[in-house]
């Protein structure tokens, strides 16, 4: 405190006015009660320049002053001035108390804010640091608005061009949000900040707030009067409707949507509201669910499963989130279904639509509309019977015939009871045969994986699955989901084998077969991931045909004669033992071969050394022979000389 008092006298004697700009840190650190406005602009300037924390750890705008000034005691005034300037800069946006705390702002990874529900949604910046964030809006003493840049300390009357560019960018992104595919994102970060959008700001840019896991329901969204709290599945603070029958506790499933619209980490709740619900489809466009016919966003995005019937026919699926159909009118909502084993990547747009009665994706999209038209035209028929028809008619052929009758003659041209009997006959025909589900039969109540057009393989979730237990409201048999099994390449054939092995026509809970979709293009692509659900009471799992499908497509005549049971004895053998044996034999052969080769190499070296010795001995002998010849010549000369002398 003594040093603090001495510094205070130095700063107040005019030295601060001369050298304040060159030493902003000194002015920032020791600005006190007598100088509430001296370090005011320097708070603005040094907040960005001297911030030690990276931008993805704390919010730049909502940095709490307590983090920086907590070591000294006389800075209450500076804190108030700083928070007041932050509020003035944002044009009077009032912050929620959670937003100004350090533990909350450390959870965010983008520069977005969360405002009170009564105000407009606050702005979203595109990057972790945007140059438009330096500008703030103030009101001058004459009452006019002016804009101040805290980094360059420039004031001007007109709106800064960074703001105009950002508004233009966000408007364009809002226009393109319906048709655009998601960019490659950091999906872990997206799980952490489950973002929820408010799609009803008319004419303004699309703004959303990143919510952390500790947010309360009132500041997760900027709600308008038309929003309904029941449509947002909030994490850890869900607003359950009064008749919520089933809750599925599953691990977070990522929705990489262009404008994030659903909360990925939420436990999904089935809500039976008897009122028209607003819901967000996978591309962020909000669609009113009163429409009984498929709107323009329905073909581009493969609408949800068939809606489960009210009353005793309560079908609860372990992986899907079906909305219950109300008694007054069917509301086909556009909420995308999420399975625990498949991440719905961006829906495939129907750029080239195949013929109507051959593309099973169109069958899937037309199901809610067909239900609605059935109920509108046959108001005296029980809606559960219609749902039974559409549930039981899972084969391609029967669904083709039903939809063909719908499209040509209308629903009044045939009898509903005949359809029910036909579907029951189909299901009883295929029930005794214990065949595994085909990958492309049009099952109206099973989850599927969307296939991104950029990546032609199905995107599967890498999060390990917990066993999903869902308890239906009527029957008490839980269903457990078995883990994912890869299947071989499956071709996208138009007509498939009529298999309804798991379907019961009675009011027991239907065990949904997780038959997954390939892309809308009719071409062979890598096979989907199968998840098979079975009743936990019987604990029987439908056998997966791991490599049953041949590479070529089955013609209808071949599909009629094809039987999985005939080739089941050669499928799925445990290969671990054979692989271990083969690897052991390979290693042994390798070791024996190396030993043998090393022996041969040593023998070769020995023989080469012997050859070298022989060569050396041969040269020595030659040298000796030459030497001896030389000696013989010399001796003969000496003989001759001696003979002459004698």
UniProtKB/Swiss-Prot annotation:
Top-level taxonomy: Eukaryota, Metazoa, Chordata, Craniata, Vertebrata
Positions of modified residues (Phosphoserine): 53, 131, 142, 225, 446, 511, 523, 525
Main function: Acts as a linker between gene transcription and histone H2B monoubiquitination at 'Lys-120' (H2BK120ub1). Interacts with the RNA polymerase II transcriptional machinery via its WW domain and with RNF20-RNF40 via its coiled coil region, thereby linking and regulating H2BK120ub1 and gene transcription. Regulates the cell-cycle checkpoint activation in response to DNA damage. Positive regulator of amino acid starvation-induced autophagy. Also acts as a negative regulator of basal autophagy.
Sequence ranges of Basic and acidic residues compositional bias: 38-50, 158-174, 182-191, 226-239
Quaternary structure, from the entry: Interacts (via coiled coil domain) with RNF20, RNF40 and UBE2A. Interacts (via WW domain) with RNA polymerase II. Interacts with MTOR and other components of the MTOR pathway including RPTOR, RUVBL1, RUVBL2, TTI1 and TTI2.
PROSITE patterns named among the record's database cross-references: WW_DOMAIN_1 (PS01159), WW_DOMAIN_2 (PS50020)
GO biological process: chromatin remodeling; DNA damage response; mitotic G1 DNA damage checkpoint signaling; negative regulation of proteasomal ubiquitin-dependent protein catabolic process; positive regulation of DNA-templated transcription; positive regulation of macroautophagy
Protein name, UniProt field: WW domain-containing adapter protein with coiled-coil
InterPro entries in alphabetical order: WAC (IPR038867), WW_dom (IPR001202), WW_dom_sf (IPR036020)
């Amino acid at each position: 405190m003594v040093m603090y008092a001495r510094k205070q006298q130095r700063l107040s004697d005019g030295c601060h006015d001369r050298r304040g700009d060159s030493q902003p840190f000194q002015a920032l650190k020791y600005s006190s009660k007598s100088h509430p406005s001296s370090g005011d602009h320097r708070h603005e300037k040094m907040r960005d320049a001297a911030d030690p924390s990276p931008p993805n750890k704390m919010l730049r705008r909502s940095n709490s002053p307590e983090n920086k000034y907590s070591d000294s005691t006389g800075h209450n005034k500076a804190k108030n001035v700083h928070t007041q300037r932050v509020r003035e800069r944002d044009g009077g946006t009032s912050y929620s108390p959670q937003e100004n705390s350090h533990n909350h702002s450390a959870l965010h990874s983008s520069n977005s804010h969360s405002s009170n529900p009564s105000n407009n949604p606050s702005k979203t910046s595109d990057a972790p640091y945007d140059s438009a964030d330096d500008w703030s809006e103030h009101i001058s003493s004459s009452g006019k608005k002016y804009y101040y840049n805290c980094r360059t300390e420039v004031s001007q009357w007109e709106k800064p061009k960074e703001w105009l560019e950002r508004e233009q960018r966000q408007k364009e992104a809002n226009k393109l949000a319906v048709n655009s595919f998601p960019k490659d994102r950091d999906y872990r970060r997206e799980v952490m900040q489950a973002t929820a959008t408010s799609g009803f700001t008319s004419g303004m840019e699309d703004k959303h707030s990143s919510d952390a896991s500790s947010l309360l329901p009132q500041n997760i969204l900027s709600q308008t009067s038309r929003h309904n709290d029941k449509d947002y599945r909030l994490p850890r603070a869900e607003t359950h409707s009064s008749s919520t029958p089933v809750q599925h506790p599953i691990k977070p499933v990522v929705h990489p949507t262009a404008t994030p619209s659903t909360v990925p980490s939420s436990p999904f709740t089935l809500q039976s509201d008897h009122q028209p619900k607003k819901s967000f489809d996978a591309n962020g466009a909000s669609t009113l669910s009163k429409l009984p016919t498929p709107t323009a966003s329905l073909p581009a995005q493969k609408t949800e499963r068939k809606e489960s019937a009210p009353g005793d026919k309560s079908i609860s699926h372990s992986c899907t989130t079906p909305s219950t159909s109300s008694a007054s009118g069917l509301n086909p909502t556009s909420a995308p279904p999420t399975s625990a084993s498949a991440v719905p990547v961006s829906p495939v747009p129907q750029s080239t639509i195949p013929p109507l009665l051959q593309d099973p994706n169109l069958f899937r999209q037309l199901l809610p509309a067909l239900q609605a038209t059935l109920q509108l035209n046959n108001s005296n028929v029980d809606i559960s019977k219609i749902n039974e028809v559409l549930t039981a008619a899972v084969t391609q052929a029967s669904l083709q015939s039903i939809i063909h009758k719908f499209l040509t003659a209308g629903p009044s041209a045939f009898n509903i009871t005949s359809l029910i009997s036909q579907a029951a006959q189909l299901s009883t025909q295929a029930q005794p045969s214990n065949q595994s589900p085909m990958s492309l039969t049009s099952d109206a109540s099973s989850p599927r994986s969307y296939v991104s057009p950029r990546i032609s393989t199905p995107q599967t979730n890498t999060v390990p699955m917990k066993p999903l237990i869902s308890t239906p409201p009527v029957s008490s048999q839980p269903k457990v989901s078995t883990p994912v099994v890869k299947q071989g390449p499956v071709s996208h054939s138009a007509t498939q084998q009529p298999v309804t092995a798991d379907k019961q026509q009675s009011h027991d809970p239907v065990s949904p077969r997780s038959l997954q979709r390939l892309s809308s293009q009719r071409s062979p692509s890598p096979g989907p991931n199968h998840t098979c659900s079975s009743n936990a009471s019987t604990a029987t799992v439908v056998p997966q045909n791991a490599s049953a499908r041949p590479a070529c497509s089955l013609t209808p005549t071949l599909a009629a004669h094809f039987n999985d049971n005939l080739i089941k004895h050669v499928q799925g053998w445990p290969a671990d033992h054979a692989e271990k044996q083969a690897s052991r034999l390979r290693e042994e052969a390798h070791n024996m071969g190396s030993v043998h080769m090393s022996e041969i190499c040593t023998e070769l070296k020995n023989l080469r050394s012997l050859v070298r010795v022989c060569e050396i001995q041969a040269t020595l002998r030659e040298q000796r022979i030459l030497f001896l010849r030389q000696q013989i010549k010399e001796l003969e000369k000496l003989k001759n000389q001696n003979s002459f002398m004698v």
